[in-house]
């Protein structure tokens, strides 16, 4: 059991019964020339976020936490995105951008394409779980809840992009399903102006979960890492 300093109060949990969730660290959201960039959002500050996620992932893996990677997107015909009868069709900025710029059709958030791929600096490893998701929330139309419950996992540590969209949506849905959600604020980035980040973190810390940072997370986990390695050797 570790105790993680967080706002509004510290939270205790067992690393091996917890998961680190990396939300949508795809070229679409973190790279120049990706969907967010093409849609007019600023992605120039994502480099430190990528580095911090790498740090958090390494610490979590050493402590025996499950790592779950999400990739947001759809088939290349966008059937999974929903047609005009779906609010997603009208509100998705990726779909709107492609309607405004037909030359991008089939390129944004399409499975198998560069936009959909995780950034080069972040690579899932054996034992990690990679899940596609068709909407903002990682709980909608995915096996996430089943994966977590079958492993006895109740605490979820969130990183990724965008704090105010997919990260917050997934954490909120987890709250309604009785999961404890923690966001590492310096391992996330918003879609939109800086106040969107602050508003999302305020909502999470006040109503739905807890907010911490990568340094605190790694420091809290450091005593757990040798225990996880010892357990692996014992059962090898």
From Swiss-Prot:
Record-annotated active site: 24 (proton acceptor), 133, 166 (nucleophile)
Q: Which reaction does it catalyse?
A: (Z)-3-ureidoacrylate + H2O + H(+) = (Z)-3-aminoacrylate + NH4(+) + CO2; (Z)-3-ureidoacrylate + H2O = (Z)-3-aminoacrylate + carbamate + H(+); (Z)-2-methylureidoacrylate + H2O + H(+) = (Z)-2-methylaminoacrylate + NH4(+) + CO2
InterPro entries for this protein: Isochorismatase-like_dom, Isochorismatase-like_hydrls, Isochorismatase-like_sf, RutB
Top-level taxon: Bacteria
- TM region(s), chain numbering: none
The signal peptide, as residue positions, is: none
Its EC number is 3.5.1.110
SUPFAM superfamilies the UniProt entry points to: Isochorismatase-like hydrolases
Function per UniProt: Hydrolyzes ureidoacrylate to form aminoacrylate and carbamate. The carbamate hydrolyzes spontaneously, thereby releasing one of the nitrogen atoms of the pyrimidine ring as ammonia and one of its carbon atoms as CO2.
State what protein this is by name.
Ureidoacrylate amidohydrolase RutB
- Gene (UniProt): rutB
């Amino acid at each position: 059991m570790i105790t993680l300093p967080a706002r509004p109060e510290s939270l205790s949990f067992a690393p091996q019964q917890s998961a680190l969730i990396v939300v949508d660290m795809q070229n679409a959201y973190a790279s120049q020339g990706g969907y967010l960039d093409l849609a007019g959002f600023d992605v120039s500050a994502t480099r430190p976020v990528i580095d911090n996620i790498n740090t958090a992932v390494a610490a979590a893996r050493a402590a025996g936490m499950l790592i779950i990677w999400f990739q947001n997107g759809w088939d290349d015909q966008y059937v999974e995105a929903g047609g005009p009868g779906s609010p997603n069709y009208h509100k998705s900025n990726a779909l709107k951008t492609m309607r405004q710029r037909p030359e991008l059709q089939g390129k944004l958030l399409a499975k198998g394409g560069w936009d959909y791929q995780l950034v080069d600096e972040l690579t899932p490893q054996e034992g990690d779980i990679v899940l596609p998701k068709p909407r903002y929330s990682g709980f909608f139309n995915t096996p996430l809840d089943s994966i977590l419950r079958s492993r006895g996992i109740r605490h979820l540590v969130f990183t990724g992009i965008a704090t105010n969209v997919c990260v917050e949506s997934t954490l909120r849905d987890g709250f309604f399903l009785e999961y404890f959600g923690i966001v590492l604020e310096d391992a996330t980035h918003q879609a939109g102006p800086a106040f969107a980040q602050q508003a999302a973190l305020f909502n999470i810390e006040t109503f739905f979960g807890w907010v911490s940072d990568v340094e605190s997370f790694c420091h809290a986990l450091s005593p757990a890492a040798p225990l996880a390695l010892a357990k692996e050797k014992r059962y090898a």
